[in-house]
C-alpha cells in the first residue's frame, strides 16, 4: 500500500482528506489492489459490484457491447479516476463493462461501507462522501456532453461537435484527443470508415488539420 499512498492522496476521491485519516479510511473501504493486462475485463457487464474502481496506473475503457459485437465507448478513465461508483452505491447490475485499455492497476473500494453515518463523525468520512458526489456530478456532465455529440444528425456534425468541445476544454485550437480512430468511432457511435472519410473532407475543406490523435482547428 505504501508505494501507492501518493497516488491515493492525489486522487480526486480523496482530495482534502487529512493524510493521518487515510489508513483508517482505506481499511474501512476494504481497499484491495490488482493488476490487469491490456484487454482484460475488470468488471463485466451484467454483474453486480459492491466496489468502485480507482485507477492507480494505466487506463480503463467503460464500454457497452451489443449482441452483434458493436461497441459503444462510454468513457475513458485514467490514473486517479474512478468507475462503477453508481453501481457500487445502488447495488444495480452493471449496464456497462470496464476493460483495461492498457496494463493497469486498479484499487477496489467498497464505498457502500462509508455511505452511512460515521460513528466517529470523522471529517475524512464526510469529505469522502462529498468528493464522491462531486465525481458523480462530473460524470453526469461528461455523459450529457457525449449525448450532445451523438444527438447530431450526421457523422460530420458529430465530429465537429466533439472536436469543438475538446478545443474548448483545452483552451486552444491545437490539442490531442484521448482516442485512436476506432475508439473515436465507437465513442461517437459511427462507422469508422465513414468517420475517416469525413475527417479527410473536413481537412480538405480547410476546417481542420490532423495527424493521428493530434488536431488543429482552423477558422
What are these regions (language model features)?
Residues 29, 73-133:
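Cyclic-nucleotide recognition modules
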Residues 155-158, 162-219:
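Phosphate-/nucleic-acid-contacting segments
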Residues 129, 133-136, 140-143:
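Long, hydrophobic or amphipathic alpha-helical segments
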Residues 123, 143-155, 169-175:
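Short, Lys/Arg-enriched, Trp-marked, Pro/Gly-tolerant hinge/linker segments that flank
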Residues 28-29, 47-49:
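Short, small/polar residue-rich loop motifs at catalytic or cofactor-binding pockets
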Residues 1-38, 87-89:
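Cyclic nucleotide-binding regulatory module and flanking cytosolic helices
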Residues 39, 50-63, 68, 79-80:
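Glycine- and acidic-residue-biased ligand/ion/polar-headgroup-sensing regions
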Residues 41-47:
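Short phosphate-coordinating micro-motif centered on Lys-Gly-acidic
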